[in-house]
Amino acid sequence: HVLDEKSERLLSYFSRLSGTPGSVYNQLSTADIKFGSITLSTGDEVQISEGEAGRIFATSRNHEDRKAAFIERNSTYNDNINTYAASYDGICQRDWAYAQARNYSSTLEATLENDNIPVDVYLNLLEQGRAGTAPLQRYHKLRKEALKLEEYDGYDSAIPVIDFDKNYDYDAVAKMVKNSIKPL
C-alpha cells in the first residue's frame, strides 16, 4: 500500500497534524483535568485522582467509598465528554483518511497490516472472546458472594476477597527477599 513518490510526499505533509487529536486528549486527560474530592466513611476528605481512585478501589473495604470514588472520577470525565468525543472522532477520521489514501478496504485492515495480522484472525479473536465470558461472569458472581455484597460493580473488582491489611517497609521486604534467595 505504498504510493508513488508525489503521493507519499503529500501525505507526509499531514503527519504533524495527525497527532493533534491524541495531543488534545492527552492535555485534557492529564494537564487540564480537575478532579473533585469525596468524604470517606471514616470522615476523611480525599482529593480524587486516577491513582487515588485506584487505591480506594483496591484497599477500601467500604462499598460506598469505592462507589463514591468511581462516581467522582467518572463525573470529571463526563464533564468533558463532548471534547473527548471530538478528539476520538478526529482519530477515527484521520485513520479513515489514511486508509482510503493507501487503498485499504477499512481502517481495521490498515491498522492490522502493520503487525501482519489478517482481519479474519482479529475478528475470530473477538468472537472467541465474546463466546468465552461465562467463566469470567461466574468469577465475579463468586467474588460478590465472597465479599457479601448486595450489588457488585466494576469498582468492586480490585478489592481483595481476603481482608489482609499488612504493610511492609522497604528494609523488611529487602531482608525477606534476600533470605528467600539464600538457598539458590
Task: Identify the role of each PLM range.
Residues 123-138, 155:
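Long, non-coiled-coil amphipathic alpha-helical linker/lever segments
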Residues 118, 140-184:
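A conserved glycine-rich
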